[in-house]
Amino acid sequence: MTTLAVIVTSVAAVLAATAQTVQVPIFEYDPTFPKPLPENWAIGAIGGMAVDRQDHVYVIQRPGSLRGNERFTGSGDTPAKADCCIPAPPVLEFDQGGTLIHSWGGPGTGYDWPQTEHGIFVDHKDTVWLAGSGDKDAHLLKFTRDGRFLQQFGKPGMSGGSADTRNMGKPANLTVDPASNEVYVADGYGNHRVIVLDADTFAFKRMWGAYGNKPDDTPPGPFNPDAPPAQQFRLPHNIAISRDGFVYVADRPNNRIQVFRKDGTYGNEVFVSRRTLLQGAASGFALSADPQQRFLYMIDGANHHVWIIERLSLKVVARFGQQGLWGGFLNVPHAITVDSRGNVYVGENFDARRFQRFLYKGLGTPKAGTIPVTTIVR
């Protein structure tokens, strides 16, 4: 297995002080995942990632983000300018070996494909849910795992803001609660809310903003890290439900994750890289695979890290990853998911346009130096 030299940054002193007491998840970069794609396919920016009950890994990517020199074969030019490349279909499904087993997506009959592919989730019925963050994206889509269209909620271009219960507003991501068969949406790039619908009928159930407040679309103004915490979401970018019934929401530009009960009652919050500007630090997260789901793995798209957070205490305990385009490094991580074995999958945006697997190696005490992936204790 290829090893990766990682330079330990300024938290090394903290590492030395806590190394004897802190046990954190340790990961190793897996250079074998995924296998090469067929037909000279190229992938664009990664919108979202998910894992199903079979531990198959789903990726939704943006073919439209490929540049001209990355799509010569599919450009329609005669003769073709080069052998590479053809944009891959938006939805890709891989088995645990990294082999592509299904690919589908794009415009079709009976539904409106998103302008900008973003969120993906596979529920307890093996239904694949999709969300888009383009300017006109105000809807959700449901498909079978092999790409047969099932249902659409909302209509493109029809968003009525955060009070609208018939449309979304550039939704970022979603999750389905199997206990109640409800879909929870981080409705996010246009609106500023969590909205909950019946997963079959799309009947409206409830919605809330930051701290459980009524959603408010009043422009919040530029982010100021020295100001009191914003009382509304700036951009709820990711959402997940823990096994013990708590709802976690990543509010990206506010650099925080907030915790709620399923009825929208506010519980707690954690700020990570609180002074981050740009697009914000709290790009998304996944829950660890152990029965207690002890950890949150939060991707930080601005600082190019994965932060490890104790879920119940919300204490930031470690991180891995640093900026770079080499295997095992990170460049604008935008999506994250975890399989049943605890392996972490990270999808990247902008120039990286890739997804990587980090193998879970158990709990341990990380050490500074040259190891496959350095987990740095905070």
Q: Can you say where each PLM-predicted feature lies in the sequence?
A:
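Bacterial N-terminal signal peptides
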Residues: 2-14
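Eukaryotic scaffold repeat domains enriched in small/polar residues
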Residues: 17-378
